[in-house]
Amino acid sequence: TGVQADVAVYFPDNISKLYQLTQWLPVFENHPNDLTFAIVIRNIHTFNFLQGKTSLPLAHVPNFSDVMNLYRVSPFKAVVYVNNGVANFQSLTVPELAHIHINHGESDKVCMVSNQAKAYDRVFVAGEAAVQRHRAALSEFNVDLLVRVGRPQLDEHPSPSISESSRTTV
């Protein structure tokens, strides 16, 4: 059966990379527009770990054929990617959907400006510095595909991960 959402957030990786997704969950859960999101997970351990940790629907699709079937029967209009995992390229085979790379942060690391950016319909970046990094590092890359969005996950105000204490934190 399909998942009722406008946007699929594709995450094929194991729990060790879950930080790449979890920083975006509040943004997807509290999206200011009427867009709805669902998390598409390939790894069963990641799927089990996320149960009850998000209000978004979760879909476990372990195999390529499962991913293709989910995309076929769901009303998704776009797929969002939070990293450059090699398994993203299986999801990218669906031409009817818009494929958007949002990454999990920005830095001067090579992976922030790899040729993988050319595979996506749009690449969301924090700002002009990211645009300049792409322009300088990639040949034959259309910087018009870069969309400046800031860092929306920083607009969320998560609860502190450490309990309140009278002790000084350094």
Predicted regions and their residues:
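Extended catalytic core of nucleotide-activated donor transferases of GT-like folds
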Residues: 45-116
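Short, conserved loop/helix-junction motifs that constitute active-site signature segments
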Residues: 28-31, 90-96, 114-119, 140-141, ...
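Short N-terminal or domain-adjacent regulatory/targeting segments
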Residues: 1-5, 12-15, 104, 149-159
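A short, charged/proline- and glycine-enriched loop
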Residues: 2-7, 95-97, 164-170
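Short active-site oxyanion
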Residues: 33-37, 77, 118-123
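A nucleotide-sugar donor-handling region in carbohydrate enzymes
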Residues: 116-170
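N-terminal pre-catalytic "stem/leader" segment of glycosyltransferase-like enzymes
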Residues: 1-71
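Helix N-cap/beta->alpha junction signal
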Residues: 13-14, 43, 83-85, 126-129, ...
